[in-house]
From Swiss-Prot:
Protein family according to the UniProt entry: Belongs to the Niban family.
Record PANTHER family: NIBAN FAMILY MEMBER, PROTEIN NIBAN 3
Protein name: Protein Niban 3
Stored CDD domains: Niban-like (cd23949)
Gene source species: Homo sapiens
InterPro entries the record matches: Niban-like, PH-like_dom_sf, PH_domain
Organism placement in taxonomy: Eukaryota, Metazoa, Chordata, Craniata, Vertebrata
Tissue: Specifically expressed in B-lymphocytes.
Taxonomic superkingdom: Eukaryota
Gene, per the UniProt record: NIBAN3
Length: 697
């Protein structure tokens, strides 16, 4: 435990948490077991608020320092040399919200709990809501319950879920009572959907058919991934600073291993940090006092955890909201003060880094040779297999999609079926069923890589897999956007179908070449970034006792600069990061034969998801420009046809590809508010899109 931190005295009052009695949380009827209106008494809630205040008091100084360092990093990158090999594909800068999914399910809920029909909705922001029936949802009624999907794990095996539940309270297995709702859980559920969270109550759903279960599984997994990596995907200085501050704060508490604690929003991350710190003491104090046995006690435990989590999350959210004005003012001030002095700051940083590198070279090289070098080749190769297989699956799907368009253009001059193909092609990055092939490839090496990384304290496999999956989706989105842009530029109304198909085939070749270049660059970034995540905390922990003792003698040089953007600890970590990255690059050259693998300082500072121009906000429409309207003119759409909206949607890829179109592009004048379902209905009935047939046609 860190300084000023006390154990949470929550043992008193936990006798009241009894499965099958009491009431659930207001507005959330999701728990299988019941609980009193508040499992925590006033004193316990006050104590938790004190714990959150202590966390913020210790964390915010780290955050302020990292904000300054992040602004310096951003300015130096803007002013420094650019990468010789940049992205070839056009950037689809902002990924969309998850597709909304809705339908009937049954849920284990109520007091006493029983399986009851509900109407469930996965919102575009990844939030899950459930209603008493469909009409309640359609009429804008209040939901029975809702939850953000951050941190949940989805299980579709009832046996696996029961084993997980039993593991929560293993000491009480076999002690069954009439209170325990085992009969409800052990009645076979044909198509279950169990959502489990380490600090929150579990959600038990069941679908009516295997097809419905499969569709919900894909949708829920997409929502979990979307909400989990919102910070990692952002390139805003504040997001990068926050993640670095969390890592430094935990290192100061003695935790050096990387794990999945940084999944979620900033408030959710801080909540997870505090919950992990307090969980052992909380478990020791409260479990003996919980009534019930077996799974009844396990459910009571999740109820209590949920109450603690809610209290901590509320406090963390309030604290970060209160800090927001100061953060905005600090960022503006840092920009004004750092930019004029950036050259001086970087020169001083380089001088201190050179001296530090000389001082720690001996123990650092010894640690790398002894601990890192023997495992590095296997880690790099496994990381490469993980991302390479996923991106190869993306390439295959992309090529098939472009081939279908060319084939349809040759075979269907009426345009109705072609219009469907254009729409489907634009939707590929967000088609969960289609992209599942790529996502599965990212999962295949999880076990092997986890075994290799665990000795170094790395437990963030879920974050790593999410990163590979997100990379696959981003590259697919970029490639689709590029193809549609180039098609816009090369097609004219003077072409017949065969000529147009030939031009699309040439575009296909160009896009695949660009994709090959970008996927190679993305693989190297992925391996370098995650290699650092695996090895850097371990090396820092190994050097902690000796090398950090040398840092105070450099404080004078750093303080003389008079900027909080430079700290001896930050420069020290950058030196170690740079040496590690040299090792990783050498191994990459052996594995890939990549002569252009660079080891610039900017590269050393990169994190796994960092990509040029990546969007800080996942829920905004992309700013990808439309280019010319020749593609749409070639398809001969009347200006006010409902099919115009279809093409707009296909190029937008569910309203997420582009928004900054030419003002005279008539295709995009139709308001997107018409709705996706209406547009799909007009596809099959609209017969306009006529083409000039070739002579043989």
């Amino acid at each position: 435990m860190g300084p000023d931190r006390k154990e949470v005295p929550l043992s008193r009052g936990t006798q009241a948490v009894v499965v099958g009695k009491g009431r659930g949380a207001p507005g959330d009827d999701s728990s299988m077991g019941g609980r009193p209106s508040s499992p925590l008494d006033k004193q316990q809630r006050q104590h938790l608020r004190g714990q959150v205040d202590t966390l913020l008091r210790n964390f915010l100084p780290c955050y302020r320092g990292q904000l300054a360092a992040s602004v310096l990093r951003q300015i130096s990158r803007e002013l420094g040399p650019q990468e010789p090999t940049g992205s070839q594909l056009l950037r689809s800068k902002k990924l969309p919200r998850v597709r909304e999914h809705r339908g009937p399910l049954t849920q284990l809920r109520g007091h006493p709990p029983r399986w009851q029909p509900i109407f469930c909705v996965l919102r575009g922001d990844g939030r899950l809501e459930w209603f008493s029936h469909k009409e309640e949802y359609e009429n804008g009624g209040h939901c029975l319950g809702s939850t953000a999907l951050t941190g949940y794990t989805l299980l579709t095996s009832q046996r696996e879920y029961l084993r997980l539940l039993d593991a929560l309270c293993p000491e009480s297995l076999g002690d069954h009572t009439q209170e325990e709702p085992d009969s409800l859980l052990e009645v076979p559920v044909s198509f279950p959907l169990f959502l489990q969270h380490p600090f929150r109550r579990h959600l038990c759903f069941s679908a009516a058919t295997r097809e419905a279960q499969h569709a919900w599984r894909l949708a829920l997994q997409g929502g979990i991934r979307l909400q989990g990596i919102v910070l990692q995907r952002s390139q805003a200085p504040a997001a990068r600073a926050f993640l670095d501050a969390v890592r430094l704060y935990r290192q100061h508490q003695g935790h050096f291993g990387d794990d999945d604690v940084t999944l979620g929003s900033d408030a959710e991350v801080l909540t997870a940090v505090l919950m992990r710190e307090q969980l052992p003491a909380l478990r020791a104090q409260t479990l003996p006092g919980l009534r019930g046995a077996g799974r009844a006690r396990a459910w009571a435990w999740t109820e209590l955890l949920d109450a603690v989590h809610a209290a901590v999350l509320a406090g963390a959210s309030a604290g970060l909201c209160a800090f927001q004005p100061e953060k905005d003012e600090l960022l503006a001030s840092l920009e004004k003060t750092i930019r004029p002095d950036v050259d001086q700051l970087l020169r001083q940083r380089a001088r201190v880094a050179g001296r530090l590198r000389t001082d720690i070279r001996g123990p650092l090289e010894s640690c790398l040779r002894r601990e890192v070098d023997p495992q590095l080749p296997r880690v790099v190769q496994t990381l490469l297999r993980t991302v390479e297989a996923s991106l190869e699956a993306v390439r295959t799907l992309l090529a098939q999609g472009m081939d279908r368009l060319s084939h349809r253009l040759r075979q269907s001059p009426s345009g109705t079926r072609l219009r469907r193909e254009v729409y489907s092609f634009g939707e590929m990055p967000w088609d969960l069923a289609l992209m599942q092939t790529c996502y599965r490839e990212a999962e295949r090496s999880r076990g092997r890589l986890g075994q290799l990384a665990a000795p170094f304290g790395f437990l963030g496999m879920q974050s790593l897999v999410f990163g590979a999956q997100d990379l696959a989706q981003q590259l697919m989105a970029d490639a689709v956007a590029t193809f549609l842009q180039l098609a816009d530029q090369c097609l004219t109304t003077a072409l017949n179908c065969d000529q147009a198909a030939q031009r699309l085939e040439r575009v296909r070749g160009r896009v695949l070449k660009k994709f090959k270049s970008d996927s190679g660059l993305a693989q190297r970034r992925f391996i370098r970034g995650w290699g650092l995540c695996i090895f850097l905390p371990f090396v820092l922990s190994q050097l902690e006792p000796g090398c950090k003792k040398e840092l105070p003698e450099f404080e004078g040089d750093v303080l003389a600069v008079g900027s909080q953007a430079l700290t001896t600890e930050g420069i020290y970590e950058d030196v170690i990061r740079g040496c590690l990255l040299q090792r990783i690059d050498q191994e990459l050259k052996k594995t890939l034969g990549a002569n252009d693998v660079s080891c610039t300082l900017d590269g050393c500072l990169e994190v796994p998801w960092e990509q040029e121009g990546a969007a800080p906000n996942l829920n905004l429409v992309s700013s990808f420009l439309a280019g010319r309207q020749a593609f749409t003119d070639f398809l001969c759409l009347p200006a006010k046809s409902s099919a115009n909206w279809i093409l707009a949607a296909s190029l937008l890829s569910c309203s997420c590809f582009r928004s900054g179109f030419h003002r005279d592009s008539r295709v995009f004048l139709v308001q997107l508010a018409e709705g996706l379902s209406h547009s799909l209905e007009t596809v099959s009935s609209h017969s306009v899109w006529s083409f000039r047939p070739t002579p043989r046609q």
